[in-house]
């Protein structure tokens, strides 16, 4: 009886070892294969905004303000794009019910602040150090600070009185870079700065 148990145990161990050796496979490459991390959209920023249902309030705001040409421009820019959730919060916080209720001068100023005059892609080596905001000029003449955390989550106006997190970053249309976020952003003075506007 002992011999039978011993034989069965040895047989099972042998079969187990044989199966474990057969199930091993050779890895083709021991180096990490990098994939491109930017999504090339092959369209203008305006075409992307028009084709995305979650940006319908932003699209309507651009049309009411008649700023479509700024989103079709051929020179590069960075487009900070608030999604529908952002506009719902903006409506609630500011007492508006629709885009049409926002006075056009306020709407134009807000939209121009959401266009940075430089291409800011968070894969840029100049932005490699985390938590180091860089000042950029916007189309309305104010300054926007862009940076990222150590986990490469994009931040707007870090180090100021109010900062925001970017939800989706580094979308690359033909005319710049798009960063989508859940908030309508505004100029925020650097912490300790008593000036209302630069």
Locations of the language-model features?
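Bacterial N-terminal signal peptides that target proteins for export
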Residues: 1-13
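Bacterial Sec-dependent N-terminal signal peptides
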Residues: 2, 20-48, 192
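Bacterial N-terminal signal peptides
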Residues: 11-21
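Second-shell loop/turn segments in exported
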Residues: 42-49, 69, 94-100, 167-168
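Beta-edge loop/turn motif
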Residues: 54-130, 176-183
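Aromatic/histidine-rich interaction motifs
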Residues: 100-165, 187, 197-198
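Short, exposed beta-strand-loop hairpins at the edges of beta-sheets
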Residues: 167-175
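Edge beta-strand at a domain terminus
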Residues: 175-180, 185-198
């Amino acid at each position: 009886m002992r011999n039978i148990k011993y034989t069965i145990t040895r047989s099972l161990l042998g079969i187990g070892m044989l199966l474990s050796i057969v199930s091993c496979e050779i890895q083709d490459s021991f180096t990490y294969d990098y994939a491109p991390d930017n999504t090339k959209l092959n369209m203008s920023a305006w075409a992307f905004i028009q084709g995305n249902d979650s940006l319908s309030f932003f699209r309507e705001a651009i049309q009411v303000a008649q700023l479509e040409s700024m989103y079709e421009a051929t020179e590069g820019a960075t487009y900070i794009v608030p999604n529908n959730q952002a506009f719902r919060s903006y409506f609630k916080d500011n007492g508006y019910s629709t885009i049409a209720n926002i006075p056009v001068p306020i709407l134009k100023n807000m939209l121009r602040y959401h266009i940075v005059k430089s291409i800011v892609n968070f894969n840029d080596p100049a932005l490699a150090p985390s938590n180091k905001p860089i000042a950029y000029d916007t189309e309305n003449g104010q300054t926007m600070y862009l940076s990222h955390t150590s986990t490469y989550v994009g931040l707007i106006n870090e180090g100021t009185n109010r900062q925001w997190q970017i939800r989706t970053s580094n979308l690359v249309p033909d005319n710049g870079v798009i960063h989508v976020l859940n908030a309508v952003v505004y100029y925020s003075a650097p912490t300790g700065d008593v000036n209302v506007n630069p």
